[in-house]
């Protein structure tokens, strides 16, 4: 914004601030294998191996990649622990955090603890954040993983047969805001027709997996991230100035 407004003074100020934040994130937020989520007022970390609940949170890991603020090797390591602790191949969900808030008596994170453990933000799949996990793998150039997890959270793949539909209990054509983790409701969708996830899924699928990006007044570039796995595909571009069909 500062560049667009030709505001040199504030641009320089914020660039210095950015480097200050980056330096101190690496110094104070790295937990040894992943990034911590936050700190309580008394200095107790959240999203740390020290915690009883919420030892790891996906947001700090995915955004270390998306923001380009995290050290690249640390960010890659952090995303490997997202796979280990937050991706559930049995339920086909990507949990927001683990373990859910339910055991610790000391740490009070706020309203999130009001949800039953394994529901919505409290240890279930919060799909907005799950999409950022997909984007993070895409931005790391790990196309096969990005495609795998894109398909994992795609609602059509939670409704392939009658048993799936009875478990998921939502529409196959819209994104669920959340998916439960805890049995006997594991794999059940929560709210639908509600989440900004839809826009992120569209963006990740089109711009990163298919590699279609627009450049103002310069045209388009197509560089698929996972061409072999995707196979042939077709794009149509229709607006007031042009109509293209690209195969």
Regions found by a protein language model. Give the residues of each.
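Acidic, mature catalytic/reactive cores of soluble proteins
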Residues: 1-247
């Amino acid at each position: 914004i500062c560049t667009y407004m030709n505001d040199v003074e504030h641009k320089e100020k914020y660039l210095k601030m950015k480097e200050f934040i980056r330096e101190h994130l690496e110094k104070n937020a790295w937990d040894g294998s992943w990034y911590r989520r936050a700190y309580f007022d008394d200095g107790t970390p959240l999203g740390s191996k020290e915690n009883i609940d919420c030892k790891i949170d996906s947001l700090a890991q995915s955004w270390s990649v998306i923001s380009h603020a995290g050290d690249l090797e640390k960010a890659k390591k952090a995303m490997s622990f997202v796979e280990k602790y937050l991706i559930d191949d049995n339920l086909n969900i990507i949990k927001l955090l683990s373990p859910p808030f339910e055991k610790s008596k000391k740490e009070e994170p706020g309203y999130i603890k009001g949800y039953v453990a394994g529901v919505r933000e409290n240890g279930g799949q919060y799909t907005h954040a799950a999409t950022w996990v997909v984007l993070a793998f895409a931005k790391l150039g790990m196309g096969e993983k990005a495609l795998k997890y894109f398909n994992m959270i795609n609602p059509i793949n939670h409704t392939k047969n009658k048993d799936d539909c009875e478990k998921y209990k939502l529409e196959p054509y819209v994104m669920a805001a959340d998916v439960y983790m805890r049995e006997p409701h594991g794999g059940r969708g929560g709210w639908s027709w509600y989440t900004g996830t839809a826009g992120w899924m569209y963006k990740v699928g089109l711009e990163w997996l298919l590699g279609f990006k627009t450049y103002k007044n310069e045209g388009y570039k197509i560089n698929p991230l996972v061409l072999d796995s995707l196979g042939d595909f077709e794009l149509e571009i229709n607006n007031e100035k042009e109509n293209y069909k690209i195969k």
